[in-house]
């Protein structure tokens, strides 16, 4: 017998229900993983609310990534073995004691990568790919990172520093979070409740603007971001936490060669899964050498996923939130 968090109707965190279900059986080309921990992503919150397409049709199991030990192989799987520690992108949701995943979505873990760090798989890949694949960050450039104390944001700050960014400007929601992102390598910190981030960036850069902007907010944050994006700059949108659309006029882009780029790790999983493995290998190496650290902001029992969602929605924590089946 297995257990999972199931969403049968959209709504507040109380719709996250702990339910028994049959132990999943891996199909050909899949493996089954006994989960030791799974991460909470903001996309899970949006899926629960019904404002994001990640959840699919009701009912569904939330969650994008999981870490655990392989306990059964499906037919035709020869490159993996029972007992192997892995991170994975499951075929279904990850808020479960057992998940199945395609073999090509399984990423073995070395002894020096902890389960807790690996549970940030989606965030790690997103932070790396937004900076390097989407934005094509170059040494010496200025980077602006929204929600810099959050799961993706705190990793992006560190990765931008490793990539040789000349200046990292972090946008956060409180003074406590400002100290946190400075400790990760941010050069300048803007508290969004007290400052106009676009005006502050233009002042800090002498009017030249940021070369790269990572935007998980959308709406007017995207619109204002274009006013502090440097000529030939790249604004990468990888989320829409505001739930609001942005209105962009094309003259804003072509006259100064500014680019707005969309990015989704979920979309890569579906359409170009082979593109993910190189990114995973890079972030695994950075974790193994302690060049990159995943900050665990809070941990909850998997059965208490509702409390984890409440914690995230409170907007008070930093870093990654974990769920543990035990």
Please annotate each region the language model reported.
Residues 22-40, 51-93:
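Glycine-rich beta-strand-centered segment in the early N-terminal region that forms part
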Residues 46, 85-149:
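NAD(P)H dinucleotide-binding glycine-rich loop of Rossmann-like/cofactor-binding domains
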Residues 81, 119-194:
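Mid-domain Rossmann-like dinucleotide-binding core that forms the NAD(H)/NADP(H) cofactor-binding site
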Residues 147-148, 217, 240:
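NAD(P)H cofactor-binding loop motif with strongest signal on the N-terminal glycine-rich segment
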Residues 172, 181, 220-291, 325-326:
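Glycine-rich phosphate-binding loop and adjacent beta-alpha segment
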Residues 196-207:
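Short amphipathic alpha-helix with an adjacent loop that forms part of the alpha/beta core around
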Residues 284, 289-298, 306-326:
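C-terminal capping/lid region of NAD(P)-dependent oxidoreductase domains
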């Amino acid at each position: 017998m297995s257990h999972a968090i199931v969403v049968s109707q959209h709504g507040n965190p109380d719709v996250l229900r702990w339910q028994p279900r049959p132990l999943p059986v891996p199909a050909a080309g899949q493996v089954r993983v006994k989960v030791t921990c799974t991460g909470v992503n903001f996309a899970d919150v949006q899926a629960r609310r019904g404002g994001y397409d990640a959840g699919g049709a009701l009912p569904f199991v939330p969650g994008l990534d999981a870490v655990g030990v392989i306990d059964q192989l499906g037919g035709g799987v020869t490159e993996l073995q029972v007992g192997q520690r892995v991170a994975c992108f499951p075929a279904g949701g990850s808020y479960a004691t057992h998940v199945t995943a395609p073999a090509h979505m399984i990423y073995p873990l070395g002894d020096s990568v902890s389960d807790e760090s690996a549970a940030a798989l989606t965030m790690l890949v997103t932070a790396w790919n937004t900076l390097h694949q989407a934005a094509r960050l170059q040494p010496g450039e200025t980077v602006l990172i929204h929600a810099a104390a959050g799961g993706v944001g705190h990793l992006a700050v560190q990765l931008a520093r490793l990539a040789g960014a000349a200046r990292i400007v972090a946008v956060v929601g409180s003074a406590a979070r400002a100290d946190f992102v400075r400790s990760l390598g941010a050069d300048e910190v803007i508290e969004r409740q007290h400052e106009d981030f676009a005006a502050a960036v233009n002042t800090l850069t002498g009017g030249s603007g940021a070369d790269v902007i990572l935007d998980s907010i959308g709406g007017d944050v995207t619109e204002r971001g274009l006013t502090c994006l440097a000529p030939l700059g790249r604004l990468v949108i990888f989320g829409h936490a505001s739930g609001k659309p942005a209105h962009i006029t094309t003259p804003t882009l072509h006259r100064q060669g500014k680019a707005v780029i969309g990015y989704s790790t979920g979309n890569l999983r579906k359409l170009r899964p082979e593109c993910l493995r190189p990114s995973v290998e890079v972030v695994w190496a950075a974790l193994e050498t302690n060049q990159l650290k995943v900050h665990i902001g809070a941990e909850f029992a998997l059965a208490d996923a509702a409390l984890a969602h409440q914690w995230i929605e409170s907007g008070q924590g930093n870093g990654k939130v974990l769920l543990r089946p035990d």
